Design a protein with these regions (language model features):
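Extended alpha-helical scaffold and adjacent linker segments that couple domains
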Residues: 1-76, 80-649
Length: 649
């Protein structure tokens, strides 16, 4: 199957989109903008169509709805919709070209348009600026808030259909809330003027208001604005303002925006349909194999609307859309630009659909964008990618000869960017979700499953909660255990090993030997040999060879009483296993039963204990003893018996 890099043509600058360069200024942009060129790069969302329908009906004198409130976070497309409405209201011919099917589209001519951006603070306040734009600069000669009568008089004198837009007002209210006036603040005066303006618009037949809020930002200013809106709407009889959401990030229309803004051309519909069918076959195979749930087949149905992006892209982005500072539509557009850069210029040129797994962490722009959304630098550098090439995912991919670990980790990273704490916050993906999203024609799921299991065991910042895997700023249990193991005192590790050897080879039947000595001084060994047959366990670090160990014991007559158990191989593995057990035991001392990672710790401790036992028996596999006067050696039975005494016997 051909990649999207082969089938699609990008617009100029599609790989270098920056949030700051996309910010629109309503007051500046509606003057002198080429409407046709503007709409050539605009995708008509449901929110835009709804806004235009309501505005046109009101401006044509055919609706009692006097305005709308655009609700979405910063960067959610509110200003863009206002700009669309302004251009269409002022240009009858453009209206007919762009949205010919809207009712009443031909029922009025060019509307008067006034726009105010709340990040500006003109000396005559917002009401003076609106009056100036309507051609009546002297309508409000004082700084007192106009009452509804004064506003109605302004609208009447301006004449004709009238569109008034107020964008980003919470910062405006917030600033004036710091300016005292009488028993309150200037913001109280502005709030009164704002309410009066909305009430006047309701009572003026062809006046339509568009106002925007900033959800999740400027809390104090938003409270003033919302209070003014409630005062204007709550007349007990009529609903004056409707709410419109510019873009639904969870739906498919965001893909229409991305396609329109980033791509010059896409392949024909029949090619896209073929891609969808190929993905369907791959998903069906996964369902039959029990790797995927039947719901995964829905992705194939969505590809025609989301191509060249995977349907999961907006679903994962929706997890962090409410992050403070993430500018929703603008932010997602920049994020998609970084994804395409990973495909066109990075390591993911084979992508048949652009998904979160294709972000290339070696690109500085990708790392910077992820850092802007949520600072997970530690997770990225330790677990996924760093310039030294020793992040866990990099090591796994080098060993396995594919990029599945990095790609799985990048998908989990994108799903982990939500920062708002609370019961509603969801981070991460369940393993079956990840397998669903990485399933593609010619891409087996098995390598991803194996890579994910290794990441779960080795990554320092990968956590699990309610079956979902996610990266966090805080190190996980793996990291804590690694630190304990790394800093374990050598003397304590030696003592742990001694205790385990004494336990493993303890003589219950006493048929082969009567007692065990481990890492003891030569004089103690000789004293024990004078009494009974002894299994003496020696550490290679104490004597380089069994013969050297015998020489260290010196001369003793009871040579037939000696069985020397010597570690012949794997001492490094044994030390590592002992350190893991030490770390797990130490962590268990600090965790109570109610700790969220207690069950995981107990499972690890059991596994580490079992691995240590196996390492002990595999290492100490060489039994040396005297047969007559000859010092001989016997390899112990390693057929799986865990009882050391039975192995020696």
């Amino acid at each position: 199957m051909k990649s999207i890099k082969e089938l699609c043509e990008l617009r100029d600058g599609a790989l270098e989109v920056r949030v700051g360069e996309q910010i629109e200024n309503l007051e500046e942009d509606i003057r002198g903008t080429d409407g046709r060129a503007f709409f050539a790069g605009t995708y008509v969302t449901r929110g835009l169509e709804e806004l235009v329908r309501k505005a046109v009906a009101r401006l044509a004198g055919q609706s009692s709805c006097a305005g709308v409130v655009l609700k979405q976070a910063l960067g959610g497309g509110k200003t863009h919709l206002m700009k669309c409405a302004a251009l269409l209201a002022a240009d009858p011919e453009l209206r007919r070209e762009v949205m010919p099917g809207v009712p009443h589209i031909n029922d009025f001519g060019a509307a008067r348009v006034a726009a105010f951006n709340g990040r500006n603070r003109p000396p005559g306040f917002f009401w003076g600026e609106i009056a100036r734009q309507l051609g009546l600069p002297n309508a409000f000669t004082t700084l007192e808030a106009p009452d509804s009568g004064a506003w109605k008089n302004l609208f009447r004198r301006a004449g004709g259909p009238l569109l008034v837009m107020l964008d980003e007002m919470p910062p405006y209210f917030e600033y004036y809330a710091t300016q005292p006036s009488g028993n309150g603040t200037v913001a109280d005066i502005i709030s009164n003027a704002y309410t009066n303006m909305l009430v006047a618009a309701r009572e003026t037949g062809q006046a339509f208001m568009i106002v925007s809020t900033l959800e999740g930002a400027h809390a104090r200013g938003s409270r003033f604005m919302n209070h003014a809106l409630r005062d204007a709407v709550n007349d007990g009889e009529r609903r004056m303002l409707d709410s419109v959401t510019p873009v639904e990030l969870e739906g498919n229309e965001i893909y229409g925006i991305l396609r329109r803004r980033l791509f010059r051309s896409l392949p024909p519909e029949e090619v896209i349909a073929g891609v969808a069918e190929d993905f369907r076959r791959s998903l069906e195979e996964g369902v039959k194999a029990g790797v995927l749930d039947a719901a995964a087949l829905q992705d194939a149905d969505s590809i025609r609307q989301t191509y060249p992006f995977h349907p999961s892209f907006s679903k994962i982005a929706a997890l962090f859309k409410d992050n403070e500072g993430f500018q929703q539509t603008r932010g997602l557009l920049e994020l998609a630009s970084r994804l395409l850069k990973s495909i066109w210029q990075g390591s993911s040129g084979d992508a048949c659909l652009a998904g979160a797994q294709h972000f290339d962490p070696s690109l500085a722009d990708v790392r910077d964008k992820f850092r802007d959304i949520a600072r997970l630098d530690g997770a990225l550098a330790r677990d996924i990618w760093n310039e030294q090439g020793d992040a866990f995912a990099q090591e796994l991919d080098r060993r396995n000869g594919h990029a599945c670990a990095t790609r799985a980790a990048m998908m989990l990273m994108m799903s982990s960017l939500a920062e708002n704490a609370g019961a509603e916050t969801v981070r991460g993906l369940a393993p079956r979700e990840l397998f669903r999203y990485v399933t593609a024609p010619g891409a087996a799921v098995a390598p991803f499953r194996e890579a994910l299991e290794e990441l779960r065991g080795r990554a320092w910042y990968l956590h699990e909660e309610d079956g979902r895997l996610y990266f966090d700023r805080n190190e996980n249990l793996t990291s804590k255990l690694a630190s304990y193991a790394r800093n374990a005192p050598a003397a304590r590790i030696r003592e742990l090993l001694r205790e385990r050897l004494l336990e493993t080879f303890a003589p219950a039947e006493k048929l082969a030997y009567a007692s065990v000595l481990c890492f003891e001084a030569p004089d103690r060994v000789r004293a024990a040999l004078a009494r009974e047959r002894v299994l003496y366990i020696a550490m290679p670090g104490d004597a380089p060879t069994p013969e050297a160990c015998m020489r260290a014991l010196g001369d003793f007559p009871e040579k037939n009483n000696l069985l020397l158990l010597y570690g012949s191989r794997g001492m490094g593995n044994l030390d590592e296993a002992a350190r893991r057990v030490y770390a797990a035991r130490r962590a268990a001392q600090t965790m109570g039963n109610g700790h969220p990672q207690y069950a995981e710790l107990q499972e690890r401790l059991n596994n580490d204990e079992h691995s240590w036992n196996a390492a002990v028996l595999a290492t100490f596999d060489s039994l040396h003893y005297f047969h007559g006067s000859r010092f001989t050696v016997k390899k112990l039975d390693t057929s799986g018996k865990d009882n050391g005494e039975i192995r020696v016997r």
